[in-house]
Amino acid sequence: MTVREKAELIVKDIKKEQETNPVVIFKHIAKKEYVSIHGPEHHILDGASLLVAYKNAGGEIDLEQALDRLMAEGLRMPGAMCGLWGICGAITSIGAALAIIDGTGPLSMDGTWGNHMQFTSKAIGELGTINGPRCCKRDAMIAFKNGIDYVNAHYGVILQYEQMQCEFTDFNEQCIKERCPFYE
């Protein structure tokens, strides 16, 4: 199955979610057979989970249009960018979702451009402290924690968050176990 096919299934299935906690939405979809333990489909799944939770919490967006745009942006992000480019796709996916919510672009001067950069640098700093190897599930949880804090501080909606233990350890051959803040 191609990344595009996985992305289309993610977008189709995620529209059915009713939660205001993006981590719960993420876990529902991440357990589906078409989502790999690691892979570039997370570049769509992570931001899409945030967008759906935002909409469900009362955020004003055209969800159909937002998910289409997020899928297009996520498909431009290559796999392994964390190791090859030094930036995590989970974090860039959440950053893309924030840009969609705010209508931010490269020439934006309303403060959102800088705010998104601050979100990204804070989240990537946490990942850097934990260190590798990559884990798309752990990295998503760090991105969500920071993304939820950002949404709750900036948008007048409240997304739910609670730190949950990882349910994917047994499927990850490179799990860092005790070094991971989500390890059971």
Task: Give residue ranges: language-model regions.
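C-terminal auxiliary extensions adjacent to catalytic cores
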Residues: 151-162, 169-177
